[in-house]
């Protein structure tokens, strides 16, 4: 949203920080990831629930439901358990397929 420029800039900056630290820490055996949640049911999204209920029903995401905080937690748990030992600097989208919907 153009009304949330500060939020958008901060998120974009995290992408660069992820790549920077992935490169710097790889020699130490430390992998770095960026976890990008999509539409997640939370206090932050509560004010726009009706809007996103409609968008999700209309196919905003291939997985037609709100994301839950536990969806993000499960992704982070997999990373913390070293489930991807030969991967670093990557974006992990937890977004119900939102990023592929325009194929």
Where are the model-predicted features located?
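Active-site "substrate specificity/gating" loop of NAD(P)-dependent dehydrogenases
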Residues: 1-4, 26-27, 103
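Non-catalytic, hydrophobic alpha-helical segments
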Residues: 72-73, 79
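Catalytic tyrosine of NAD(P)H-dependent dehydrogenase/reductases that use a Tyr as the general acid/base
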Residues: 7, 15
């Amino acid at each position: 949203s153009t009304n949330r420029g500060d939020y958008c800039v901060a998120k974009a900056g995290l992408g660069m920080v992820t790549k920077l630290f992935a490169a710097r820490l790889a020699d130490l055996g430390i992998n770095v990831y960026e976890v990008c949640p999509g539409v997640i049911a939370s206090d932050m999204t509560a004010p726009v629930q009706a809007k996103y209920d409609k968008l999700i029903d209309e196919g905003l995401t291939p997985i037609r439901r709100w994301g839950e905080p536990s969806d993000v937690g499960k992704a982070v748990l997999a990373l913390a358990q070293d489930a991807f030992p030969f991967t670093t600097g990557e974006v992990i989208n937890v977004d119900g397929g939102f990023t592929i919907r325009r194929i």
